[in-house]
Amino acid sequence: MNSQSFKNFPSLKFISKKRRKERLLMVLLCLFIMAITTGLIVYAMRNTANFFRTPSEITKEDILTGRVLRLGGIVEKGTVEHNGEMQVTFFVIDHLKHEKVVFNGLLPDLFREGQSVIVEGYFDKQGLFIGKRVLAKHDETYMSKETADRLKKHHDIK
């Protein structure tokens, strides 16, 4: 090939600038897609990463919105009532308040009065907590030290 045939090709400097621009656009596009994906994942998991709240931490907003949350505390002694075949009502208490819980289903073997419990559910329109899942705890190892100390101070955990 003679030197005349290379005149029709763009200069190497121009090619490297063009490639650099394309790479930059590709990196920016990937970062944008990753940011959107992360945002969608966080948005989708906003209700699944919920810790429990004690009855005194429940707000009016929690009651009015009807969103799923976890209610944690101690099953108040003398409040467990079996209504019908599978329906159970009981109160979950902490040092300040108590909440009535209605649960339809089988209770775990570790469920007992005076024992720690976490109930996953929601508040209905009447402000009654409807439990969908009961997690009974054999001791306070599943809760933070501060919460365990707070509950021990006001109730006898077995």
UniProtKB/Swiss-Prot annotation:
Q: Which UniProt keywords apply?
A: Cell inner membrane, Cell membrane, Cytochrome c-type biogenesis, Heme, Iron, Membrane, Metal-binding, Signal-anchor, Transmembrane, Transmembrane helix
Membrane-spanning segments:
24-44
Could you tell me the membrane topology recorded for this protein? Answer: Single-pass type II membrane protein
Cellular location of this protein? Cell inner membrane
One GO BP on record is: cytochrome complex assembly
Q: Which Pfam families match?
A: CcmE (PF03100)
Q: Does the keyword Iron apply?
A: yes
UniProt topological domain (Cytoplasmic) ranges: 1-23
- An example Gene Ontology molecular-function term: metal ion binding
Q: What residue ranges lie in the Periplasmic compartment?
A: 45-158
Please give the GO cellular component terms listed in this UniProt entry: plasma membrane
- Where is this protein primarily located? membrane
Q: Where does heme bind?
A: 138, 142
- What biological function has been recorded for the protein in this entry? Heme chaperone required for the biogenesis of c-type cytochromes. Transiently binds heme delivered by CcmC and transfers the heme to apo-cytochromes in a process facilitated by CcmF and CcmH.
Q: Which family does it belong to?
A: Belongs to the CcmE/CycJ family.
Any idea what this protein is called? Cytochrome c-type biogenesis protein CcmE
Source species, please? Answer: Bartonella bacilliformis (strain ATCC 35685 / KC583 / Herrer 020/F12,63)
